[in-house]
Amino acid sequence: MQSTSSRTKMKTINADSLTPILIFRRLQGNRKFLLESSAQHEGAGRFSFIGANPRKTYKGFGDEIQEYSYKTGNTYTHKGDLFVLLKRLMPRISNTTQFPFSGGAVGYVGHDATTILSTAQDKVQLPDVHFHVYETVIVFDHVTDEVTLIHTNIDAEKKEPNLEELAEQLLKGREDEDTTCSYEPFESITNEQFATSLTSSKATLDEDMTRVVLSKRFLANLQGDAFALYRQLRKKHPAPYMYYVEFEDHVVLGTSPESLIRVQGERVIATPTEGTYPRGSTKGQDLEHERKLYENTNIRKSHAVLVSAVRQELQSVCFRDSIQVIEAMRIERSKHALHMTSRVEGQILPMLHALDVLAATLPPFASIGIPKDQAKDYLEKSSQTSGIFGGALGFIGFNGHLDFALTGKSIVIENETMHMQSTVTVTKYTNVKEVLKQVEKDEQEFLQLLEKEGGQH
């Protein structure tokens, strides 16, 4: 047993017979989470994080946060700006672990978290922000093949858990039985309705608002287990960010190719992604497709606009002269696609919290449009905001580190209904008929990813 501080205890075990999925299935408890990264993605993350049985939860609606303690059963209501409240409520405990996340909050922030009064009506009635706070976290190191159990006491006097027993549970425990799932899709909005939205949005574009992102929700009935659905999705569509998080009355799962923002100490890291191209079937085709993606003038222009917007956005939370494009228009590979991405870094301003950085980057450009303020106003006035799908999911560590991924391709499961969405960026050059065909194709391809031996019943 190691101690990194008076409040933090650790135990390391050999992981050569374990996987993050197996650990999750053996871990006993409620409101479990799994955050992982695909080894099939070049430059994938080194660590996976697993946890269960949070100490408390924060649930935000409009201008108030409900804080619920699982220890006492008490609920406390706090009024004010959601991010100001979160900064005040989130525990901050320093430690010297080498891991980016060793305990803290896991959850999501939706589109409306930065808007106290919104006229938009989201079809999934979920909180604007929702976080569970975990004192005990399991870290899987894919490089050293080790698993580290970490417990951080929020209250110094609280009794510590037995990490030896937890290690025994993970190494020899009985995992949950294999489960299956199937689904039956149904339409939530017709193509005619979406075409009307596209046409109306296109007509409003001008020099002040050059692009706006619209979303089309589609639904399916789920029969079976949500975690089986996640396992199928991660197998068919691995990505740098893969997540499965259980809440009281819903589950959020998905695989995302794109980070929204990271904060590591004083460093703020954004990786804007714009431009995709299918993978080739051979190494030679991959290189040829990379060349086509890189040499596409329209994609490069659009990518440059996004990078410029991200740099400008970071000026509100970073020293201006510290903001630099470290990597420009780099091509990254996922299992199915090539992505053009850049890396922008800056140094956070003193006295600011990582949550200030997160607030400054929401809603993401990828889910709203450019310029952000004008696109946001338009979507809210026309009741077309995308709720959780227009936000981000990730962790906020006790140590102040933060890492969030975009949630546009998430699946939200509530009352056996799967909520999903397609998005399209509308410009003055958008061909409505072509967009409708592409959206329908995207929906079919996404549902096909979830099929297993026929999958759909």
Residue spans for each PLM region:
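Extended alpha-helical targeting/anchoring segments
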Residues: 1-457
